[in-house]
Amino acid sequence: MSMDIIKGNLDGISKPASSSRSRPGSRSSNGSLEVLSPEPGPVKIDMVNKLNSGKEGHTSDSRVEERRKISDDEWADNPRSTEPAQESSDEDSNLSQPQGTPEHSDDPKLEGTDAVLQNAIHKMHRLDKILAKRRIREKEIKKQGLEMRIKLWEELKSAKNTEDLENDEELENTKKFLYLTSKSAGTAAEPLHCKFEDDLFSVFHTQIPQETYENHTEKDFTCDVEKNGPLIKTEKQPFSNTEAIEPRSEHSQVFIIRNAEHSQDFIKRNIELAKSSRSPVVMVEGEKKRLDELLKGLEDTDSGLSSSEGDQCAWLVPGEGYTLAATESQQLAEIDIKLQELSVDSPAVFSLESQSNKGDMEHDSNEERNTEPTPGEKILRDNKEQRDRESRLRAIDGKLKEINEQVEECPVITPGKRNERITWRWLLAKILEPECKV
């Protein structure tokens, strides 16, 4: 910014005009004005002009113009009151004052802003130190809370094991608390709960660092709160409201690790369930063999049932299964003869005798062949043998009772070796008599 400094005699001039100025270097008489070249301003003014905005430059220009108008008005009112030298000195001082005022008016502003910034920086450092102390204190309190919860968990487990509780209500409440806590948060003695923020590690290589993690986990933390609400409640119980304001950065990674381990356990459990999906019932080796034998027998019976009625005895092993007694076979043969006599018109009559003869022939032809009986046939045969033994024992008991009654009715026999032999022979004959008849 340049400015022309006017110097000369102002006699006879009523009002100065901007067009009355002459070019630099021109000279005039006493009534003329002389325009001098502008003096170089100090370096500080240029620096201030660079730092100040365009608005400050505009205000400085307006101030200079206002002062020039005021000086012109004063000269118009009192044209002869001042001397040229005094006028020039006053004008120089008036013109130099607006150039010097920015230096004096702006430097205190800059110094004031610098002082404000320095105070703000010092205050920030002081608050950072206070915040660091508070965070350290919060970590210590949370560590103490975790230790107290672990101790409480151990005491409850020991009380549950030793049954030292006073009444049934306390025992029931303790069981419920242990069940809910173990279901939501797992065992408190796990090393996972003893880890703190300093011991945490990143799960993924793209994970945000721990310093800037708090600003990026608000949304993830809300999801973790919904999934692990009981765990957060148990974590917040030992702390006050002011201490529980910032649990995000410390517990969010714990939740991530817990969810990762839970997903791995879920995958392992699914693999184990898929392995045993085809065998819903756990069986021992002996039970499996027995089941295979029974299934084999069922397959044989199914194949036999699918055959025709004429081949009913073809799938039976000879000599096994239900066999008729001699008296029953004779009675059935007599019934068959009577049916044949009565039903002459019927073309097809079932002949049991022919089937029994056929079975006997097959049994004679296959005597040398040793076949393993099926489980069902073996059970039927064992049951038949047991029934036969029981019937024989009952018959023997009845005969013995009859013999005892007959012995009581017989006359007294003198003792002797010959009489004893006769008595025993007679008893044995009585016992074996019904078997011989059969």
Swiss-Prot record:
Residues 53-72, 359-371, 378-390 have a biased composition (Basic and acidic residues). GO terms for cellular component: acrosomal vesicle; nucleus; sperm head. The modification Phosphoserine is found at residues 71, 88-89. Residues 18-32 have a biased composition (Low complexity). Pfam families: FSIP1 (PF15554). Transmembrane segments: none annotated. Belongs to the FSIP1 family. This is Fibrous sheath-interacting protein 1.
